[in-house]
């Protein structure tokens, strides 16, 4: 029973070559349950949309028995997002966000990859450590023209990997970048935060001919190229070194200053941008990695500390890099949307099920985000709420989709046989 709009059903057909016929039927039912809200409280509840001869046990088989490749699903989802957003002509540079998030399962036992993680925000009545899963997610960052006629950064999830002991998050980001199978001939820039940008990540991205843009700590040491070489002996690889928080004080003559405006703390503010080409040490054995160090200062906010950014894409302008990094916060919006869809509600215990469930949630969030930004055109009824005027947010679009589907809570039984 296909209750979803025909546009979404047509888009799901792109995933049919990745699985068998009976598996694709279960895949469609799970996506229907996720979008409508039934699968959030139990995957087997997606079988209410199935015909009478469908066995609900096949829902569990999708996560454990059937041969479904999460890597192929993520690669196909990435290709679908790029094709819907840009058509046949891709821009010369694409931005991607990588970050990690946690799902809390305080009473779970004997579930694959369940661990204790440091709780980033204090919750009254909860322990300092969080028991649950950690996911490393990737999202495509692009600009969208909103209802007010302004260009805004938005992002759509394209894949997720499950954190396991023995693997670092930067290494998982590099693995995720390889599994997305991004198109060649395009400059792909990965935007990460201070806890992820590191030498293992830079090595992994360099092997893929991709680039990184991230915020570094104030004590990050960078090097300048040597200005003078000795007449005899070995050539110098590195020149003077300096911490990024001391660049303005020690080497103001080597920095290029620019002025621009950026949306900071709720309003447009003037910012000062200082950048210089530097060298990073330890990424490649015996060789330096060229990068650009960027210092961002907001003069109107005296208590706001400067931002220290580093990018390995030397062709990316400093102002464009700062604006792109400002869009990194969109991944937090994606995490809220994914958790609302049920990222932490999967009740299975197998590792394959935990991994596949995260990919299905990413697919559902990407479809809703593309529809909310007008990339996917859906004819859905409006709710006309007096207390909430916006109809194109992801949450409101999902409620409109539920109103359109009006799912039945009982299954259609076959007619009894007559003798």
Predicted regions located by residue number:
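Long, contiguous hydrophobic alpha-helical segments, chiefly transmembrane helices and signal peptides
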Residues: 31, 35, 44, 59-63, ...
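Residue-level detector of functionally special positions within alpha-helical transmembrane segments
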Residues: 54-57, 99, 193, 332
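Active-site-proximal, Lys/Arg-enriched surface segment
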Residues: 31, 64-151, 279
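Short N-terminal helix-initiation segments at or just after the protein's N-terminus
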Residues: 32-44, 76-80, 128-140, 248-254, ...
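A generic secondary-structure signal
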Residues: 50, 80-84, 175-180
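Gly/serine-rich nucleotide phosphate-binding loop at the start of the catalytic core
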Residues: 1-66, 70-71
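Single, function-defining residue in the core of a domain
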Residues: 1-19, 28, 35, 92, ...
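Generic hydrophobic, aliphatic-rich segments that mediate packing or membrane embedding
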Residues: 43, 55, 77-78, 92-96, ...
């Amino acid at each position: 029973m296909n209750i979803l709009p025909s546009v979404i059903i047509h888009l799901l057909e792109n995933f049919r070559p990745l699985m068998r016929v009976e598996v694709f039927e279960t895949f469609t039912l799970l996506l229907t349950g996720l979008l409508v809200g039934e699968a959030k409280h139990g995957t087997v509840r997606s079988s209410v949309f199935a015909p009478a001869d469908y066995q609900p046990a096949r829902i569990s088989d999708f996560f454990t028995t059937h041969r479904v490749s999460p890597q192929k699903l993520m690669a196909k989802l990435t290709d679908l997002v790029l094709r819907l957003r840009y058509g046949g002509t891709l821009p010369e540079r694409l931005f991607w966000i990588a970050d990690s998030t946690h799902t809390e399962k305080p009473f779970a036992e004997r579930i694959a990859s369940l661990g204790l993680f440091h709780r980033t925000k204090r919750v009254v009545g909860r322990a300092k450590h969080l028991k649950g899963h950690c996911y490393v997610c990737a999202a495509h960052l692009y600009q969208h023209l909103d209802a007010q006629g302004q260009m805004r950064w938005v992002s759509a999830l394209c894949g997720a990997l499950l954190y396991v002991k023995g693997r670092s998050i930067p290494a998982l980001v590099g693995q995720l970048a390889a599994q997305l199978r991004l198109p060649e001939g395009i400059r792909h820039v990965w935007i990460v935060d201070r806890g992820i940008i590191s030498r293992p990540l830079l090595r992994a991205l360099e092997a893929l001919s991709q680039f990184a843009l991230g915020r570094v700590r104030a004590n990050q040491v960078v090097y300048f190229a040597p200005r003078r070489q000795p007449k005899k002996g070995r050539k110098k690889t590195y020149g003077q070194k300096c911490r990024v928080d001391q660049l303005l004080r020690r080497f103001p003559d080597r920095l290029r200053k620019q002025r621009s405006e950026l949306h900071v703390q709720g309003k447009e503010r003037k910012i000062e941008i200082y950048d210089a080409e530097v060298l990073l040490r330890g990424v490649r054995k015996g060789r330096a990695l060229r990068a650009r160090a960027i210092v961002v200062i907001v003069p109107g906010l005296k208590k706001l500390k400067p931002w220290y950014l580093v990018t390995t894409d030397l062709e990316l302008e400093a102002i464009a890099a700062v604006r792109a990094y400002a869009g990194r916060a969109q991944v937090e919006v994606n995490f809220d949307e994914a958790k609302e869809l049920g990222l932490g509600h999967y009740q299975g215990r197998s590792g394959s099920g935990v991994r596949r469930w995260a990919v299905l949630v990413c697919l559902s969030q990407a479809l809703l985000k593309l529809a909310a930004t007008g990339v996917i055109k859906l004819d859905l009824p409006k709710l006309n709420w007096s207390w909430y005027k916006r109809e194109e947010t992801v949450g409101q679009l999902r409620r409109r989709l539920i109103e359109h589907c009006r799912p039945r809570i009982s299954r259609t039984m076959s007619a009894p046989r007559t003798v």
